[in-house]
């Protein structure tokens, strides 16, 4: 078992990484003494883990569960409203707790419900995907709007994050790719040694188990925890965590949510941001080396066919980092050192045109 403590201005809490913790959740929740518990999960996770979690919480407090469809489309206003209604109908009060049992979609949605129900109640993140190692830490919770991803949300830190690496045994290949993108991102922005470690040890997702899984999770989460501790509300440094997300979110929105996983889109965004970095800083980055490794792991690294430069730029202008209509990118000066920088729209347009043209020829 490993425990990492996250320090923020609003809350201090632990991230516990422990095999078998799903069947022991009750022992972590009991000291918090919730008046009632609402588990929010999706249909795929429910089939695998809901009964285990329920058994662990048995007799702790009145227990309820809502099972939603799996997929990015679930992170909608309709489901947010339905969960608020369920919480009211179940009689949750301000001492009640929500448990987010699932991946990033469930964590974001359930966390936003917790942030706003009766002006805020406690919640615990129980991630069941690799992607959620990133989204479960830091307190950013949100739902999507048809005009943009994560546009309606809040900052609301969990009481705890309980992570059972045994869940990796049930992850499909695409979920591995979605989650590993955020791991790579953490190395690129702040920890060159971790990035080198990943390239050395992860040549197949089946390697992510046992001690390697635990080290990967802890080192990746530590990067995020350090940034969140310094900038909880994303006034500055925390925006570095958006490497690859400016274009990545635009690709997700333009293709339609669910057509490409978040991590698959972020990888394309990372490669684009690194190419943009080379043009801005006039120095080379190990892009070919990164692309070769990512392709070996099954990623597509080019902008999907059918997307239009103008539409992508229009969507990027809705990005939360935009200031006074100017697109701001997270760029790399070198591996392990990221910066936030305003980028001339014409330069973005020219590089997008080149990338899209190369993909169609």
Swiss-Prot record:
Cofactor note text: Binds 1 divalent metal cation per subunit. Can use either Co(2+) or Zn(2+).
Binding site for Zn(2+): 182, 245, 262
Catalyzed reactions: 7-phospho-2-dehydro-3-deoxy-D-arabino-heptonate = 3-dehydroquinate + phosphate
Protein's recorded name: 3-dehydroquinate synthase
GO CC entries: cytoplasm
Cofactor dependency: NAD(+); Co(2+); Zn(2+)
HAMAP family: DHQ_synthase
The entry's keywords: Amino-acid biosynthesis, Aromatic amino acid biosynthesis, Cobalt, Cytoplasm, Lyase, Metal-binding, NAD, Nucleotide-binding, Zinc
Single Gene Ontology MF annotation: metal ion binding
Entry binding sites for NAD(+): 104-108, 128-129, 140, 149
Protein function: Catalyzes the conversion of 3-deoxy-D-arabino-heptulosonate 7-phosphate (DAHP) to dehydroquinate (DHQ).
The family this protein is said to belong to: Belongs to the sugar phosphate cyclases superfamily. Dehydroquinate synthase family.
GO biological process: amino acid biosynthetic process; aromatic amino acid family biosynthetic process; chorismate biosynthetic process
Subcellular location: Cytoplasm
